[in-house]
Amino acid sequence: GRPLTSTRLKTVTLLLDAPLKKGAAVIEAEYSGKMNELMRGLFKARGRNEGKEESWAFTHLEPTHARRVLPSFDEPDFKATFRLTLDVPAGLQPLSNMPALSDVTKNGRRVVTFAETEKMSSYLLAVFAARLAPKSRKVGKTVVTVWAPPEQLKQADFALDAAVRALGFLNKWFAYPYMLPKLDLVVSPDFASGAMENWGAILFRDASFLIDPKLSSDAAKRRVAEVVSHEVVHQWFGNLVTMGWWNDL
C-alpha cells in the first residue's frame, strides 16, 4: 500500500493493496519528532537549575495534539493501552500516567520504563521530564503525590490537601474507587491552560496550584481548590467515561 499525507489535518491515510482480513492487524511505523514551544503536543518549558535556565518537557495532547507526538488514532472514542519508556538527562524526573517498573541511571542518562496504562484515549497520555521533588500522602491504596520544583514544594501543601480530600470524597460518592495505583499532581512553569487531567498525572500551571500560606489570599486558595477538585473529578468524567467527540461536551 501507500500513505496519503495531509499537512492541514496532520493525518496519514494508508491505502491498502487488498482488503483487510477479519482478525487482528498490526501497523508498524518508525517516526521522530521535535519538542515545540507552543505549549501543545510535546512542549518545552523553561525551568531553573541552580539559577540557570534549563529545558524541561511536558505534554498537552487535548484535543487532537497526540498526533503531534506519535502516530495514533487520537479521536477520543478510540482507546488503547500504552507502554512507555523515557530516556532523559540524569538530573530530571521522568513521569507518566503509571508507576515506574524500572529506573536506571547510567552515563549521564536516566531510563525509566512505566507500567502499561489502562485502556484510555490518547489525549490523556502524559510524558513529563523536569527537575521536581515529591511529597506524598495516601488515600486508601492510592498514592497521591505533588511534584514541584524543590524550592516551591512547601507551596504545594494546600493543593495536596485539596486533592486528598477530593479523591476521598469522590471514591465514596461514585461508589467506584479511583482505578490507578497513583495520582500525581505536577507543576509546570509554562502551561497555557490552568490544568490538564491526564489520567494519573495531572498537569498544572504553577499559578493555578502553588499557595504561599503567608501571602496568598482566600480567593487564591479557593481558586486552587476549585481547579484541583475539577481535575480530580475528570479522573472519572472524561478519563474513565469518555465522550465520543468534543461536541459532546
Q: What is each PLM-predicted segment?
A:
Residues G1-N49, N107:
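A surface-exposed beta-strand-loop module
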Residues T13-L14, A66-V69:
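Short acidic, glycine/Ser/Thr-rich loop/turn "cap" segments at secondary-structure junctions
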